[in-house]
Curated annotation (Swiss-Prot):
Domain of life: Archaea
Chloroplast recorded as keyword: no
Annotated catalytic residues: D129
Protein name as annotated: Probable cyclic pyranopterin monophosphate synthase
InterPro entries reported for this sequence: Mo_CF_biosynth-C_arc, MoaC, MoaC_sf, Mopterin_CF_biosynth-C_dom
Gene Ontology annotations of biological process type: Mo-molybdopterin cofactor biosynthetic process
Keyword terms, alphabetized: Lyase, Molybdenum cofactor biosynthesis
Membership in a protein family: Belongs to the MoaC family.
Function of the molecule: Catalyzes the conversion of (8S)-3',8-cyclo-7,8-dihydroguanosine 5'-triphosphate to cyclic pyranopterin monophosphate (cPMP).
Gene: moaC
Chain positions recorded as substrate binding sites: M78, C79, H80, M114, E115
UniProt-listed SUPFAM superfamilies: Molybdenum cofactor biosynthesis protein C, MoaC (SSF55040)
Gene3D superfamilies: Molybdopterin cofactor biosynthesis C (MoaC) domain
Length: 158
């Protein structure tokens, strides 16, 4: 097996820095990310029937995902502020989990995978927040609630 040493573009002499993208061309870019939250059967039924105390779980999670995408550079230090030209948020209810897919588009100098990942993460955290009273056990903990499989599904450039 041959190992190729890779260098990190955001680290120079052990100092983190934002990469200069001034010379890059503006091109159409897209990233799609996904993840899921595992919930109890009782909570899943409340989501299905629209009886969650805090309100519409999916509507709230969609808005939260959009806001998170737009705020990504405020929470990820080396992420560039780029114009977001489109955001799609899809939430689906499964047997024991809710899945989220966030697609982000831009015409810019750098990709939008961090924005898509941030959108998915915040959508799932918002679902958790909306249903946490139903998910808590008698000690106030969440023994079965689990966010998992957050990943980039696709990234396109050009």
């Amino acid at each position: 097996m041959i190992f190729v040493e890779k260098s990190f573009t955001h680290i120079e002499a052990d100092r983190a820095r934002m990469v200069d993208i001034s010379e890059k061309n503006n091109v159409l870019r897209m990233a799609r990310a996904a993840g899921e939250i595992v919930l109890s059967a009782e909570t899943m039924e409340k989501i299905r029937t629209g009886t969650v105390e805090k309100g519409n779980v999916f509507a709230t999670a969609r808005v939260a995902a959009v806001l998170a995408v737009k705020k990504t550079p405020e929470t990820i230090p080396m992420c560039h502020q780029i114009p977001i030209t489109g955001i799609d948020v899809d939430l689906e209810i499964g047997k024991d989990s809710v899945s989220a897919v966030v697609e982000v588009r831009t015409v810019g100098k750098t990709g939008v995978e961090m924005e898509a990942l941030t959108g998915v993460s915040v959508a799932l955290l918002t679902v958790w927040d909306m249903v946490k009273s139903a998910e808590k056990d008698e000690t106030g903990n969440y023994p079965h609630t689990l966010i998992r499989n957050i990943r980039v599904l696709e990234k396109l450039k050009g």
